[in-house]
Amino acid sequence: MKVGIYPGSFDPVTFGHLDIIERSAKIVDELVVGVLNNSAKNSLFSLEERVSMIKEMTAHIPNVRVGCFEGLLVDYMKKINATIIIRGLRAVTDFEYELQIAQANGVQNPEIETVFLTSSLNYSYLSSTIVKEFASYGGDISKFVPEQFIDRIYAKYNITR
């Protein structure tokens, strides 16, 4: 059984993330969306909120489950028996960074393969940072995130629509 992991902070989760998740789920038997708990980082959403939002958004995909981890990805992968890392690429700058990380992970565990998926054209510009920037000013984020998350995101900035 091929178990893959799509790791990230997903703060907040976007249509770009969903695009990668849906496409990744077609190439592995089981896909774990691994939500990183980085206590050194100030997240907009708590770990529990991020996990909950991803579960909501991926409920229609039977071979996807959501987990969370802190520390090294390669250590978490051993725990869940995953051998494939899925990474989404938006631009050349993403590739340069992700290639270095993939090589470092391969040194840690040579059985790990990293698969790069280019983002769909509709989402090649999209990031959680962009969502937060627009939301913080009350901008329209309906093209960036699922409808059911919009009010939750605005609420973090004390904004109502």
Curated annotation (Swiss-Prot):
Location of the protein in the cell: Cytoplasm
UniProt site (Transition state stabilizer): H17
EC number(s) stated in the UniProt entry for this protein: 2.7.7.3
Keywords: ATP-binding, Coenzyme A biosynthesis, Cytoplasm, Magnesium, Nucleotide-binding, Nucleotidyltransferase, Transferase
Gene Ontology molecular-function annotations: ATP binding; pantetheine-phosphate adenylyltransferase activity
UniProt enzyme class: transferase
Family: Belongs to the bacterial CoaD family.
Name used for this protein in its record: Phosphopantetheine adenylyltransferase
Gene behind the chain: coaD
